[in-house]
């Protein structure tokens, strides 16, 4: 399963804007734009699976909200601190979306 939430990243929004402009000019059809977005979803998921090796830890003062729907967990944390090696970042509120990393071998 390829999730679409990576489309909300800067790269994903820029891709969507570019595809919208190309459709407005008549350079591509909506069907082609959708195929590009589906390929983007799959490529991002594959790249993170194959090359995402960074480790990070975090703590939070409070777990404000949590929910699970269709194997997608959403967590809202208050007063969180993220640490990686010598770097740390403190934030007032953070939203974490965690998805099932495999599709039971059906890729």
Swiss-Prot record:
Query: Which InterPro entries is this protein grouped with?
Result: TFIIA_a-hlx (IPR009083), TFIIA_b-brl (IPR009088), TFIIA_gsu (IPR003194), TFIIA_gsu_C (IPR015871), TFIIA_gsu_N (IPR015872)
Q: Which UniProt keywords apply?
A: Nucleus, Transcription, Transcription regulation
Judging by the UniProt lineage, the source's domain of life is Eukaryota
Q: Which Pfam families match?
A: TFIIA_gamma_C, TFIIA_gamma_N
GO process annotations (BP)? RNA polymerase II preinitiation complex assembly; transcription initiation at RNA polymerase II promoter
Q: Does the keyword Transcription regulation apply?
A: yes
Q: Name one GO molecular function term.
A: TBP-class protein binding
Classification via Gene3D superfamilies: Transcription factor IIA (TFIIA), beta-barrel domain (2.30.18.10), Transcription factor IIA gamma subunit, alpha-helical domain (1.10.287.190)
Q: Which GO terms describe its cellular component?
A: transcription factor TFIIA complex
Q: Where in the cell is it found?
A: Nucleus
Q: How does it assemble?
A: TFIIA is a heterodimer of the large unprocessed subunit 1 and a small subunit gamma. It was originally believed to be a heterotrimer of an alpha (p30), a beta (p20) and a gamma (p14) subunit.
> Family assignment?
Belongs to the TFIIA subunit 2 family.
Describe the task this protein carries out: TFIIA is a component of the transcription machinery of RNA polymerase II and plays an important role in transcriptional activation. TFIIA in a complex with TBP mediates transcriptional activity.
Protein name as it appears in the record: Transcription initiation factor IIA subunit 2-2
Q: Which organism is it from?
A: Drosophila melanogaster (Fruit fly)
Whichever gene encodes this chain, its name is TfIIA-S-2
């Amino acid at each position: 399963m390829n999730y679409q939430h990576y489309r909300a990243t800067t790269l994903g929004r820029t891709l969507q804007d570019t595809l919208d402009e190309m459709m407005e000019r008549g350079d591509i059809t909506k069907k082609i734009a959708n195929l590009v977005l589906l390929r983007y979803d799959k490529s991002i998921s594959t790249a993170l699976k194959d090359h995402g090796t960074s480790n990070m830890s975090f703590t939070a003062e409070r777990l404000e909200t949590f929910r699970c729907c269709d194997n997608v967990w959403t967590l809202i944390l208050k007063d969180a601190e993220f640490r990686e090696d010598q770097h740390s970042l403190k934030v007032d509120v953070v939203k974490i979306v965690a998805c099932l990393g495999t599709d039971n071998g059906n890729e």
